[in-house]
Amino acid sequence: MSRIGKKPVAIPTGVTANIADGVLSVKGPKGELSMPLSSEVTYSLEDGQLSVQPVNDTKRARSFWGMQRTLVQNLIDGVTQGYSKTLQITGVGYRAASQGKTLKLQLGYSHDIDFAIPEGITIQTPEPTTVNISGIDKQKVGQVAAEIRRWRRPEPYKGKGIKYAGEFIFRKEGKKK
């Protein structure tokens, strides 16, 4: 039995959830999100709570149970609070600047990198070495952060590169003479 899946998802005031044609739509103060529903589980919306139950007792249905409940919770959290990730840039001459719909990155290459900011994502650079990514879709925020980080992953000798805020970079000792 799924410990996560058996808990119903509370729908706070100011948020409306609607199930129609195999799609769950959630509308809140920050915006609107929707996701296709899985046929492995059933969804019931009653008394300001959305509960998820597996269709049958197969391993596949049970594994989808907790995941689908978590995805529904992520939708509701996104339209009420939103999600954000912070990236830190370390290295001499490494910097970032937000210019309209693009993020300009200088990461030690012979050219600057212009990253197009996707729809529904806001990127702020309070400092040249800090990038704040925010939005209502948890998956999209994480994907954008991973794409930016991929341009220059932190290296283990000096720690230069782009890392998530709070991420531990395993450091190696250099060659001994």
UniProtKB/Swiss-Prot annotation:
Keywords: Ribonucleoprotein, Ribosomal protein, RNA-binding, rRNA-binding
GO BP term, pick one: cytoplasmic translation
Gene3D superfamilies: Ribosomal protein L6, alpha-beta domain
An example Gene Ontology CC term for this record: cytosolic large ribosomal subunit
Entry similarity comment: Belongs to the universal ribosomal protein uL6 family.
Subunit relationships: Part of the 50S ribosomal subunit.
Job of this protein: This protein binds to the 23S rRNA, and is important in its secondary structure. It is located near the subunit interface in the base of the L7/L12 stalk, and near the tRNA binding site of the peptidyltransferase center.
Entry protein name: Large ribosomal subunit protein uL6
Organism: Zymomonas mobilis subsp. mobilis (strain ATCC 31821 / ZM4 / CP4)
Gene field: rplF
